[in-house]
UniProtKB/Swiss-Prot annotation:
Residues 1-106 form the MsrB domain. Zn(2+) binds at residues 23, 26, 71, 74. It catalyses: L-methionyl-[protein] + [thioredoxin]-disulfide + H2O = L-methionyl-(R)-S-oxide-[protein] + [thioredoxin]-dithiol; [thioredoxin]-disulfide + L-methionine + H2O = L-methionine (R)-S-oxide + [thioredoxin]-dithiol. This is Methionine-R-sulfoxide reductase B1. It is found in: Cytoplasm; Nucleus; Cytoplasm, Cytoskeleton. Its cofactor is Zn(2+). It is an enzyme of class 1 (oxidoreductase). It comes from Pongo abelii (Sumatran orangutan). Keywords: Cytoplasm, Cytoskeleton, Immunity, Innate immunity, Metal-binding, Nucleus, Oxidoreductase, Selenocysteine, Ubl conjugation, Zinc. PROSITE patterns: MSRB. Its main location: cytoplasm. Methionine-sulfoxide reductase that specifically reduces methionine (R)-sulfoxide back to methionine. While in many cases, methionine oxidation is the result of random oxidation following oxidative stress, methionine oxidation is also a post-translational modification that takes place on specific residue. Acts as a regulator of actin assembly by reducing methionine (R)-sulfoxide mediated by MICALs (MICAL1, MICAL2 or MICAL3) on actin, thereby promoting filament repolymerization. Plays a role in innate immunity by reducing oxidized actin, leading to actin repolymerization in macrophages.
Length: 116
């Protein structure tokens, strides 16, 4: 079992359609489907955010290799970033709760990020 507590219902774990994952609370763009990859944890995994300010990060208590991440716009809790745990050396793994995400299919990104 991974570091995060598993609550189930991770609808985006095996979801690989082209598009953008936005904050479920405010619609801010967080992750591109291009940065998503299959991982053994039960949560969706991403290697990088869309924008430098897509997420805010703060240290996880007693876990130097883990950071808590939240939406960079509204502060909605998203999950964790695990440093140097991505698919390639030096990459991070963002372990994100499906309930904190909304998926916007390719071609619909602009209207979703503007809250339409």
């Amino acid at each position: 079992m991974s570091f995060c507590s598993f609550f189930g219902g991770e609808v985006f774990q095996n979801h690989f359609e082209p598009g953008v994952y936005v904050c479920a609370k405010c619609g801010y763009e967080l992750f591109s489907s291009r940065s998503k990859y299959a991982h053994s944890s039960p949560w969706p995994a991403f290697t990088e955010t869309i924008h430098a300010d897509s997420v805010a990060k703060r240290p996880e208590h007693n876990r130097a290799e883990a950071l808590k991440v939240s939406c960079g716009k509204c502060g909605n809790g998203l999950g964790h970033e695990f440093l140097n745990d991505g698919p390639k050396p030096g990459q991070s793994r963002f372990u994100i709760f499906s309930s904190s995400l909304k998926f916007v299919p390719k071609g619909k990104e602009t209207s979703a990020s503007q809250g339409h």
